[in-house]
Amino acid sequence: MKPLATVLVSGAAVAALVVIAALAQQRGGEVSAPAVTLLGEPVTAEDVAVGRDLYAANCASCHGANLEGQADWMRRLENGRMPAPPHDETGHTWHHADRQLFTITSLGVGGVMPGYDSDMPAFQDVLAEEQIRAVLAYIKSTWPERQRTFQADVTANDGG
């Protein structure tokens, strides 16, 4: 026979799971994470889908098909330049405000930091503004809730 305390704790755990499951069904079974926004506008599923395709065509060759970046991305290459960083939660993209991400993508790193030698090209003559927004929407949509929340706060404190 099991001790009474074990039976009571097991019963309480099962009851808690039943309550959680009932609440999840009542809410449609989905857990809501912070909504993805970009430059103050809500991001749609279409934005993310378009951005995923544009990312694959224009960004993945350097930043990785899975947003993983280049190996040893924090260590300078022999030419003194930095490898392409990851855009997933292991990188630092989510530390930057939307406006900064948009500007770096549009103008390239050298356009934002004159004199900084980088392999990151400017995309303003390659992609339309809406396409750059879609790429950033896709990247942001892949981040876990913690990174999205942090980045939303950074963006809010940046005034945009």
Q: PLM features: residue spans?
A:
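N-terminal Sec-pathway targeting helices
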Residues: 1-13
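Core hydrophobic alpha-helical membrane-spanning segments
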Residues: 12-21
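Electrostatic cytochrome c docking/interface patches
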Residues: 25-54, 149-160
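Flexible coil segments in periplasmic/lumen-exposed cytochrome c-class electron-transfer proteins
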Residues: 33-34, 114-160
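Periplasmic/extracellular electron-transfer cofactor-ligation site
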Residues: 45-47, 52-83, 106-116, 142-149
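Stable alpha-helical elements in mature extracytoplasmic
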Residues: 47, 55, 97, 101, ...
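Gly/Gly-Pro-rich "capping" loops immediately C-terminal to redox-active cysteine motifs
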Residues: 52, 68-102, 122-127
